From Swiss-Prot:
One of its GO terms (cellular component) is extracellular region. Residues 1207-1306 are cytoplasmic. The modification Phosphoserine is found at residue 1300. Sequence repeats lie at residues 698-714, 715-731, 732-748, 749-765, 766-782, 783-799, 800-816. Residues 519-528 have a biased composition (Polar residues). Belongs to the HKR1/MSB2 family. The keyword Cytoplasm does not apply. Residues 698-816 are annotated as: 7 X 17 AA tandem repeats. Glycans are attached at residues 30, 859, 885, 945, 1049, 1088, 1175. The lineage of its organism: Eukaryota, Fungi, Dikarya, Ascomycota, Saccharomycotina. This is Signaling mucin MSB2. Keywords: Cell membrane, Glycoprotein, Membrane, Phosphoprotein, Repeat, Signal, Transmembrane, Transmembrane helix. It comes from Saccharomyces cerevisiae (strain ATCC 204508 / S288c) (Baker's yeast). Present with 1320 molecules/cell in log phase SD medium.
Length: 1306
């Protein structure tokens, strides 16, 4: 009973120690906390944070100054700070903000609110409150003559202004003037705003702000803008000094960019969007196209796999030095963005283009999932929705001349209000898993909501797209058309949007689904049936074999077409077939003229005329080789005509078409380390085609194929979603691995077994993947691993996240986040972020910060002057971002930041007559944020040079509560505790430290042993529960790192002690399930101190790898001992393991000691060691002996009881006989047999004697006999009288009936 009691006691002790850091403290609420601070100055700000028991936190900021915003329940200002070198320029910036909000109680259920802009309007006091923001910013910069070599260090922090966590309309008018001429020696400062809904850590959004309150109204100072030429933010991914432009914006010209770079570990994806801006450096783009004097350059560039490429675009002959990935740009009036993706193993590229006309220089750029009010001319708006199971993509843009607000038949989340000449409207609705509807309306004349419709008006084209989602198949229809009214013409590809001149607008609907088929139909009709009748304008008949080839040159690139096996049903059809072997040099296209005429095709037929004049000159060769095989395309139709470049064919009558596809397809690229080859199976389908281009470039995959050409559509229904778009149209591919390609500035959509959704064109990106995901943003490298969907968060946009771990969120009406450089020279700053975000309509986030060594804080002064000071922390800092008003569960994201700062000082001048403090504590999170007011402080200005690298790791397990800093024993304590370890010391230690949950043995895995060094000895690990938790949590990650994290079932079974005679401490040995095929490779990596096992890891995993003792074998402790113990059958071979008192310590059975030279002994329960195995065998024998002994004792006890019973009976009989001997010694001397015979004889003799005596004598004898008993013995006729004292006389009976005394005979 002592051992179970000791186990129970140790369990209670360990539980008590772990209770200090129990994960339940982060899950359940701890009551209500309130923090309120008020200044006694003229302007007051109060902050209240309430956390209820249902894991919901509400933050309330009430601010008023001079009675302007008196006691309004809304966030007034959320500002961030960044330090810029004061020697570069002198800047002064002012901004004024007024907010008001209008909503009703019923609106909260359906997320429908009415918003409008106003100026200095107070909120209503009725039940229907009113809220609307208005921003006005002006900045003046004066460049100095000093040109510092360091970059401008600006923190990227979103500015959120929200009320009740509901999005609202934001109107921004930004004007920037430069007082100094721009020369090559003048330093350039750029203005960037948060316009993407992708990443809150994007360095493309530097915003430097300070909060100031005057006597009349509140003002919001924004001080991070300068110059007409944007400064390219530094992104040093390989410890070099090269600068890659990720995102920049120049608001002096009518354009704005959005950049999102996403890199996946298993299937990396990069998505970028860029717009036009002016530069002063002299360089040529990789590829450009000049349209009618202006420049509209689609630039395509590829880099090696695994590298992060940047994107930029220019609009004048003097190009930027930045090497752009993919961009399209039109000078003077259009802004376009192009997205390209580069993957390491499976390729995926997605591109889209947006362009719109600019009438006045004042242009506002609105991010996704928000609405925009344009006061002058035009804007583009993109709305994207992400779903848990069916993530669609929807993007539209364009502009029309319209005065009235665009109306929509459906209730969408985004709307546009027009004040001036033109604007564009994009409508998108959040969907369930059953339906998707998208409508784009460009003018007051609206199209009906049907499957597909288009309407050409005086101001442009309005199109409506509706997509019904079926259970097994789906067809979507979309149309893109435009009218040209000015010499400036932009080429509009399919599945991308563009606006030419000032009177047209297209629509784009692109969706990617995990398991639901998606088909793209033409503008004329959609049919959800499994086959579609083909209507075309060309006739003819041809049957080609695989040997026939045809070559042609298209647009400056060489292409080779090879015919595949073709079978046609009609006697006379025309065949469009090709197998292209194209090698592109990415040459600079000097000029390009594209004219398109479309009478808006109908079901009967269509005619399209396309001409292309492209002259190419050699430039830097980018050698991209595509080997594609296309199907033979045979069509027939009613009597119609189709005119293409150089040919015309007409036919009469109606006929059908059949397509037989059976040919291989392969894709290769020099920039990819691998080559993908796809073998095509035979497939037959009938489709609807309207062909209007000179050639078709398609690719055949494992499934049925449909094609779409310019201003036409191809629809096909099959069991697997596959859609191909060529000739300035979209291309998509579905295969077992996500692979897709982009041609001629067109979009690419992908459908794979893994639900992945990518949305570009100023829209948010949502991803759901079962594979590790790595996100990379500008000026930072972000790596993410998640089993769930983890999007990023940006300003004024929605973020959606689904996680297996519910993490409570914090609702805040104001959020401030800032991380600046350290104030200490030559200091490495290391920070760790933990991010948890969720909520489709959340507009603000709360910030908490915790420092491990040096406290980091954000100091804000809320007083009459409302100045802000920030200080930075060095070493290790932890930030926790929690999304506002999140109702769903969210997964924690951990971000590790390491910032080397050679020299850094902060420049801040604060004049604060009165101070106040604001403190916020976010419940259910492991960090906190504090805003502390300080008095007037003057710091010396100096330059700041810093670069950060972010690593984002998402995990849905329960290891988030484990400390990230490795816990080890101090060297002094280890030396003190490492005295001689004996049997008496190990008796108090547990035999093993098992995993928290049951660990099954995976298939193909083997149990190995990983030993640790003295700093993690067994006694220390037992005494420090968090240290053992770190071994269970981070050792599998350390073992999986050199294998690129491809194994998912590496788990630690238990931690056991191992005693080595050559060591003075107990070695902690972790028993780990590891893939059998990689054990030898792991052993080689562990024995090599410079291998990837010790160098590739990051954070705690790398520290854990450094603690592994390479002298401990991986397999010897388990398998050799099993064989040795199994071979020893006699008791002598294993007796040494059982004898605890022998003290010899012989290890004759241990195969480890004989092979490695170290005599390992088991101090606990390393049950797979040699000693333990012999103990097991001996223990089994001992158990048998104990069982036999117990049975013998029980049987012996039973026999003893029976013996005692018989002995007791015998003793009782003996005592009775003894008493009889004492009473009758004469009788007792005679044997019972003799006594019986003699008695019978005497009785007979007496009877004979009595017969001869008289009657009176007989009476006397009878009386003697009756009184004294039968006393006549030994032939005595006289009675022998017994002792009267011991005898009992008998009562006489009647002698005779005649006389009771018998005297009649006497």
């Amino acid at each position: 009973m002592q051992f179970p009691f000791a186990c129970l006691l140790s369990t209670l002790v360990i539980s008590g120690s772990l209770a200090r850091a129990s994960p339940f403290d982060f899950i359940f609420g701890n009551g209500t906390q309130q923090a309120q601070s008020q200044s006694e100055s003229q302007g007051q700000v109060s902050f209240t944070n309430e956390a209820s028991q249902d894991s919901s936190t509400t933050s309330l900021v009430t601010a008023y100054s001079q009675g302007v915003h008196s006691h309004q329940s809304a966030t007034i200002v959320s500002a961030t700070i960044s330090s810029l070198p004061s020697t570069w320029y002198d800047a002064s910036s002012t901004s004024q903000t007024s907010v008001s909000y209008a909503s009703q109680e019923s609106d909260y259920a359906v997320n429908q609110n009415s918003w409008s802009a106003s100026t200095n309007q107070l909120p209503s006091t009725s039940t229907t409150s009113y809220y609307a923001p208005t921003f006005s910013t002006s900045a003046d910069f004066a460049a100095s003559s000093v040109n510092a070599a360091s970059d401008v260090s600006t923190a990227s922090v979103p500015i959120d202004t929200s009320a009740n966590s509901i999005p609202f309309t934001t109107t921004s008018n930004i004007e920037t003037t430069t007082s100094a001429p721009l020369t090559s020696d003048t330093p350039l400062i750029s203005t960037s705003t948060m316009s993407a809904a992708d990443n809150v850590f994007s360095s493309a959004n530097p915003i430097s702000a300070s909060l100031t309150t005057t006597d009349s109204s509140e003002s919001f100072d924004q001080t991070s803008t300068a110059g007409a030429i944007p400064v390219q933010s530094s992104a040093d991914f390989s410890s070099s000094s090269e600068i890659l432009v990720q995102s920049s914006a120049d608001f002096s010209s009518p354009s704005s960019p959005t950049t999102t770079d996403i890199s996946l570990s298993a299937a990396p994806l990069q998505t970028s969007e860029s717009s036009s801006f002016t530069t002063a450096s002299a360089a040529l783009p990789v590829s450009s196209t000049d349209v009618d004097g202006s420049s509209a350059s689609p630039v395509v560039s590829m880099s090696a796999a695994g590298q992060i490429a940047s994107s930029s675009s220019t609009d004048n002959p003097t190009m930027s030095e930045t090497f752009s990935l993919t961009s399209t740009e039109v000078d003077g009036s259009d802004v376009s963005s192009t997205v390209s993706a580069l993957l390491s193993a499976p390729f995926l590229q997605t591109s889209t283009s947006n362009s719109f006309s600019i009438v006045s220089p004042s242009v506002s750029f609105v991010p996704s999932q928000s609405s925009s009010d344009v006061a002058s001319s035009s804007t583009a708006n993109v709305v994207s929705s992400s779903f848990s199971d069916i993530p669609p993509q929807t993007s539209t843009s364009g502009s029309v001349v319209s005065v009235a607000q665009s109306a929509s038949a459906l209730a969408f989340q985004s709307s546009t209000e027009v004040y001036g000449a033109s604007a564009s409207s994009t409508m998108s609705s959040l969907l369930s898993t059953t339906s998707l509807q998208s409508t784009t309306l460009d003018s007051s004349s609206l199209a009906s909501s049907s499957a597909s419709s288009s309407d050409l008006t005086d101001y442009g084209v309005s199109s409506t797209a509706s997509i019904p989602l079926l259970s097994a198949s789906e067809q979507a229809s979309t149309s893109s058309s435009f009218s040209v009214v000015s010499p400036s013409v932009s080429f509009v590809p399919s599945q991308s949007s563009s606006d030419v001149a000032s009177t047209s607008a297209p629509s784009v609907v692109s969706s990617s689904f995990s398991y639901t088929s998606l088909q793209a139909g033409g503008s004329s009709m959609t049919n959800p049936s499994s086959s579609t009748i083909v209507y075309s304008s060309s006739t003819g008949s041809s049957e080609e074999s695989a040997a026939s080839t045809a070559s042609a040159t298209l647009s400056g690139s060489s292409s080779t077409y090879m015919a595949g096996n073709l079978q046609s049903q009609p006697p006379s059809t025309s065949s469009l077939l090709s197998e292209s072997q194209a090698t592109s040099t990415s040459a600079v296209l000097a000029s390009s003229s594209v004219s398109t005429t479309s009478p808006y095709t109908t079901a009967g037929g269509a005619s399209t005329e396309a001409s292309s004049l492209i002259s190419s000159t050699s430039a830097e060769t980018s050698q991209v080789s595509y080997s594609q095989s296309t199907t033979a395309l045979q069509t027939s139709s009613f009597a119609s005509s189709s005119t293409t470049e150089g040919s015309e064919t007409s036919s009469q009558g109606f006929s059908t078409s059949s397509v037989l596809v059976q040919m291989p397809s392969s894709i290769s690229s020099e920039f990819s380390p691998s080559q993908t080859t796809t073998q095509m199976n035979s497939a037959s389908s009938s489709s609807q085609y309207t062909i209007s281009s000179t050639g078709i470039l398609s690719q055949v995959s494992d499934t049925s194929v449909s094609y779409t050409t310019s201003s036409s559509s191809v629809s096909q229904v099959s069991d697997t979603p596959v859609s191909y778009t060529t000739s300035s149209s979209s291309v998509s591919q579905v295969s077992d691995t996500p692979v897709s390609y982009t041609t001629s500035s067109s979009s690419v959509s992908q459908v794979s077994d893994t639900p992945v959704s990518y949305t570009t064109s100023s829209s948010s990106v949502s991803q759901v993947s079962d594979t590790p995901v790595s996100y990379t943003t500008s000026s930072s490298s972000v790596s993410q691993v998640s089993d769930t969907s983890v999007p990023s968060t940006s300003s004024r946009s929605s973020v959606s996240q689904v996680s297996d771990t519910p993490v409570p969120s914090t609702s805040s009406r104001s959020s401030v986040s800032q991380t600046s450089s350290s104030l200490q020279p030559t200091t490495t700053s290391s920070q760790r972020f933990t991010i948890s975000t969720h909520g489709a309509l959340s507009e603000s986030s709360s910030v908490s910060q915790q420092a491990s060594e040096i406290t980091s804080s954000i100091n804000a002064t809320a007083s009459e002057y409302h100045s802000i000071q920030t200080t930075a922390a060095t070493q290790s800092t932890t930030l926790s971002f929690t999304d506002a008003n999140s109702s769903s569960a969210s997964a924690p994201l951990e971000v590790a930041t390491s910032t080397p700062t050679p020299s850094s000082k902060a420049s801040s001048l604060l004049l604060t007559p009165s101070t106040s403090s604001l403190s916020q504590v976010a419940t259910n999170t492991n960090v906190q944020t504090s805003l502390t007011t300080e008095s007037t402080t003057v710091l010396e200005p100096s330059t700041t040079n810093s670069s950060s690298t972010f690593s984002l790791v998402t995990s849905s397990d329960n290891n988030w509560w484990i400390p990230t800093e490795l816990i080890t024993q101090a060297p002094e304590a280890a030396s003190t505790a490492s005295s001689t370890v004996g049997g008496t010391q190990t008796m108090t230690l547990p035999h093993a430290i098992a995993a928290a949950t049951q660990v099954p043995e995976p298939e193909g895995y083997t149990l190995i042993t990983i030993g640790f060094k003295k700093a993690l000895n067994y006694e220390f690990v037992v005494s420090e529960p968090k240290s053992s938790a770190q071994i269970f949590g981070y050792l599998p990650e350390a073992l999986n790192t050199p294998f690129k994290n491809v194994f998912t079932n590496i788990t630690v079974l238990q931690i056991v002690p191992l005693q080595d005679d050559s060591l003075n401490y107990l070695v902690s040995v972790a028993e780990v399930y590891f893939p059998t095929a990689e054990i030898e490779e792991l052993s080689n990596l562990i024995t090599n101190s410079s291998s990837a096992f010790y160098t590739d890891g990051m954070g705690t995993a790398k520290s854990m790898a450094a603690m592994v003792d390479s002298s401990i074998p991986l397999t010897g402790l388990l398998h050799d001992s099993n064989s040795n113990s199994g071979g020893s059958s006699d008791g002598s071979s294993s007796s040494n393991s059982n004898s605890g008192s022998s003290g010899s310590g012989s290890n004759s059975n241990s195969g480890v000691s004989s092979s490695s030279g170290n005599s390992y002994q088991d101090a606990g329960t390393l049950e797979y060691s040699s000693k333990s195995n012999s103990n097991v065998s001996t223990s089994s024998k001992s158990k048998k002996k104990i069982i036999g002994l117990v049975i013998g004792v029980v049987v012996g006890g039973c026999l003893y009881i029976l013996f005692m019973i018989f002995a007791f009976k015998y003793i009782i009989r003996r005592r009775i006989q003894s008493q009889e001997i004492i009473k009758n010694p004469e009788i007792s001397s005679i044997s019972s047999s003799e006594f019986g015979g003699e008695k019978n004889y005497n009785n007979e003799k007496r009877m004979s004697v009595q017969e001869s005596i008289t009657q009176s004598m007989r009476i006397q004898n009878w009386m003697d006999d009756s009184y004294y008993g039968h006393g006549l013995t030994n032939n005595d006729s006289t009675p022998t009288r017994h002792n009267t004292s011991s005898s009992i006389p008998k009562i006489s009976r009647p002698i005779a009936s005649q006389n009771s005394l018998g005297w009649n005979e006497v």
